[in-house]
A protein has these predicted regions:
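Short helix/loop segments within enzyme catalytic domains
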Residues: 182-281
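Short consensus segments that form the blades of beta-propeller domains
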Residues: 34-36, 135-136, 239
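Cytosolic-facing loops and C-terminal tails of multi-pass membrane proteins
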Residues: 2-35, 92, 262-412
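Catalytic Zn2+-binding segment of zinc metalloproteases
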Residues: 141, 148-173, 180, 185-189, ...
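Low-complexity, serine/threonine/proline-enriched polar segments
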Residues: 80-82, 87-89, 105, 186-221, ...
Length: 412
């Protein structure tokens, strides 16, 4: 996934995940009427604050599914897709700037998975419906994994704000130098500094030798956009990028396998097409064909097709999503410094995820096949996804898993 993955958070220890799990153990022992205003729920907010410095309050009074209300800081954040951008704004961010008597400062540390400064002051609300978090459907570990995923939404949102601000600062500084200097040598030094700061290794500075400041800014921004694409030429900020980064945030805190089992339960409860037997799959598709033959049922058909769709919504296909969570475990095995106990734990998690993947299929709706046949863009996107997944398989192949197994055998 190009630069996006290279700047992901580092692998963390499991303390954050373990503390969340213990808090959910206590939540499960409460009466449903007592959950919303309980000490364990407040403690979840404190645990999040302690490990990330993020200021997140938990709302367990309602029955919303797990989600986080992202503050309206910057509607132009690259992680927000075009459809979302049409209905969000930057009011919170503008209010912060207008009400502050000094320059706002903040950092996002991807090595420690912590924020500081203004990012630790911004308030956000996470919804964990009491009906969802109680009962026996989801274990405390699965709830902790889901919570980490939602925390990841806010963390990565702030991370991409810092990237945008960094770019703006470089461009502003460059403009000031270029506007105030006719000296060609100073221009070249300034452009070279901007190239290094923005990590535009492939940019040819000779094309900027005799152009004005505004054109220079346009060229640099265009180069940055191209840098956000993968080597395959597909936009890096695809709809699934944000969800993928949040899954990764959870997995890199040691919750990968529990996130995978939670997702499997969610997919099954939604009767996802990936879990249907051949007989059920064919029966459902036949019903859709029958509905399309009757104009009176077209509205119902549209609803059924939308609910049954595997496309859009910002998520990978179920099997691809679990496979990418598995890849995080494989990536961790590349660390030669981990203990045999850790290595055994990761291998067990990979085995568990493999069992979940074995239950899935990659079936698509009949209407999806028809759409792909008539839409070249859709075919190209499917081909890109397939190639991207194949390249990821090469990078995260099972040689690392087998090597870890042999290492354990050699140490026994």
């Amino acid at each position: 996934m190009g630069r996006l993955v290279k700047e992901s958070i580092a692998f963390q220890n499991t303390t954050f995940f373990d503390e969340l799990t213990l808090a959910f153990d206590e939540v499960k022992n409460l009466k449903e009427t007592d959950v919303g205003d309980s000490e364990p729920i407040y403690r979840i907010s404190k645990i999040i604050k302690n490990h990330t410095n993020l200021n997140i309050t938990i709302d367990a009074e309602n029955d919303y599914p797990p989600c986080i209300d992202i503050p309206n800081i910057d509607r132009n954040n690259p992680l927000i897709n075009a459809a979302q951008r049409a209905i969000v704004n930057s009011t919170d961010g503008l209010t912060m700037i207008e009400s502050s008597n000094e320059v706002l400062h903040g950092t996002v540390n991807i090595k420690t998975a912590k924020v500081s400064g203004v990012f630790s002051d911004i308030k956000a609300k996470m919804y964990l419906g009491k009906a969802f978090i109680q009962g026996n459907k989801y274990s405390s570990q699965e709830l902790a994994a889901i919570t980490l995923h939602e925390v990841g939404h806010l963390f990565t949102y702030f991370e991409f704000i810092t990237r945008t601000v960094r770019t703006n600062q470089v461009l502003a500084g460059l403009s000031k130098i270029l506007d105030g200097s006719e000296n060609q040598e100073k221009r070249e030094v300034a452009l070279l500094s901007a190239k290094k700061a923005l990590k535009l290794d492939k940019l040819d500075l000779s094309q900027l030798k005799d152009v004005n400041t505004k054109t220079t800014q346009v060229v640099l921004i265009d180069a940055l956009v191209k840098e956000t694409r993968t080597e395959l030429g597909y936009n890096l900020f695809a709809e699934s990028s944000w969800e993928y980064l949040c899954d990764q945030f959870s997995a890199r805190h040691g919750a990968g396998v529990h996130l995978a089992t939670a997702l499997s339960k969610i997919y099954k409860s939604n009767y996802n097409i990936s879990y249907r037997s051949l007989a059920v799959y064919l029966a459902v598709e036949m019903i859709k064909v029958i509905l399309i033959s009757n104009l009176a049922f077209l509205g119902i058909l549209f609803l059924v097709v939308m609910l049954d769709s595997q496309d859009g919504g910002g998520y990978d296909l179920p099997s691809a999503r679990l496979k990418r969570i598995r890849d995080q475990a494989t990536q961790y095995l590349k660390n030669k410094q981990i203990s045999d106990v850790e290595r055994r734990r990761i291998l067990d998690e990979i085995e568990s995820i493999d069992k979940l993947l074995a239950e899935m299929t990659n079936r698509k709706q009949l209407f999806t096949y028809i759409h792909e046949f008539f839409s070249k863009r859709t075919r190209d996107e499917r081909a890109y996804r397939k190639l991207q997944y194949e390249l990821e398989d090469i990078a995260m192949n099972d040689l690392y898993v087998k090597a870890a197994e042999f290492k354990l055998m050699g140490n026994t």
